Every structure is written in structure tokens, then in C-alpha cells.
Swiss-Prot record:
Protein name, UniProt field: Dof zinc finger protein DOF5.3
Keyword presence, Metal-binding: yes
Induction field: By cytokinin in procambium. Induced by the transcription factor MONOPTEROS (MP) in cells relevant for root initiation, and later in vascular tissues and hypophysis.
Domain of life per record: Eukaryota
Gene that this sequence comes from: DOF5.3
UniProt biased composition (Polar residues): 24-33
Location of region: Disordered: 23-50, 104-127
Keywords recorded for this protein, A-Z: DNA-binding, Metal-binding, Nucleus, Transcription, Transcription regulation, Zinc, Zinc-finger
Amino acid sequence: MDHLLQHQDVFGNYNKAREAMGLSYSSNPTPLDNDQKKPSPATAVTRPQPPELALRCPRCDSTNTKFCYYNNYSLTQPRYFCKSCRRYWTKGGTLRNIPVGGGCRKNKRSTSSAARSLRTTPEPASHDGKVFSAAGFNGYSNNEHIDLSLAFALLNKQHPGSSSQLGFHSELGSSHQSDMEGMFGTSQQKENATYAFGNGSSGLGDPSRVLWGFPWQMNGESFGMMNIGGGGGHVDQIDSGREMWTNMNYINSGALM
């Protein structure tokens, strides 16, 4: 009993001492006591975050800087701006060694000139299985244009029966005679063509007759004048000459194309 009283006195003295110090003691801790026991956020230990590494531009690091293109169209990655090359780039892009939009270009000028040279070079014409060129007519080359109006204008300046009324001059009897024979065939067809062109005084003695057209384009009166003329031209000879003239016109047009 004495021991119990002694213990209460000690405990009472302890409580009085705490009250004197401004502290209260309770058997059940209050929420305020629990909050005081927790450490404050200011006193919590914070771990330092590692600094972000400086990202290097893959375009600047590439050795192929001339044709290197960095694809910066990856929308899933953030876009960065490089101050040295002044371009945006992303991590999800890819490097390419070819220029965008590059490629070989065909030389269109050389192709067109080659095609033009092929068009201007005519093939040798043929008639009745005989091949001849138009280069032997009065010295004209394949690239020169034959002025037929000038040739027919010489009709009123030449004598009838001359072989130079169409600008052929003396080639009909020279080395080009083989070409002319290849075009007209026999000597009879060549004679008929001569009547068609007006040789042999077949009615073209009139200087204004050259403006009337060809013999097969004239009316009946003109045919009568041709028959009356001193040459004695006939209709069958005119038809044969017209056929020969058509063949020669076709050959000349092929040479000029």
C-alpha cells in the first residue's frame, strides 16, 4: 500500500512538471499529435534530377551534308530546331542519301533535232521498179525547194521543142538521162509527156497560155486550139502525158517533204 502511494506521487509530480513545461500528456494521441509526428514536405529529402543531354542534329553530324535530307515529318516525336543548319528535325526521321526531287533529265533538244533530220531526209522514189532521186533535176538538192511557178514561167521564153522549158536545161541529154528514162519509161511516154507540157508547138505559143493551166485543165476550145496548132497533139498523147505529170508531181512532193 505504501508502495502504491509512492508511485502515484511520482506520477503526479511528473504530470505537474509537464504542465509547467507547457506539455500535456494523454493516453490516447490526438490527430494533431499524429500530424506533428509526420515530417514536413520542406524537410523531405528530394533527389536531384539529371540534366537533359544536349541533342545533336543528325543533319549536322552526317558526313554526306550535300545530299543528306532529314525527314522531319514524324508527328509522333517532338520537333527540334537546329541553329547551325537552321532546320527542324525529329528523332523519328530517317536519313536519305539522295536529293528530294532529284533525277536524270533527258535531253529533249537532241532528240527533237534527230527526229527532224530523219523527217527532212527523203527516201529515194521509185517508179515501175526503177529507183531514182530528185537531185538530178536542174541541180537541185534534196533539201532545196523546187519553184514550179518559176519553171513554168520560162515556157514563154524558150523555143518550142526545147528541153529546158521546165528548168531541166540539158540534163535530159546528159548524165541524168537515165533518171529521166526511169521516170518516163519508154521514149514514147516521154514524147507524150512533151506534148502535155507544151513542147512541139502544141498550142502554147501564146505567151499568156502559161497562165491558163495545164492542157488537161483547159476546156474544149483550148483542146481545139491545140489540135489546130502546128504540133498536131492528140488526146491519147495528152492523157499519157497527164499520167506522167502526176507521177513526177508525186515524186517532187516526196522529195520536198
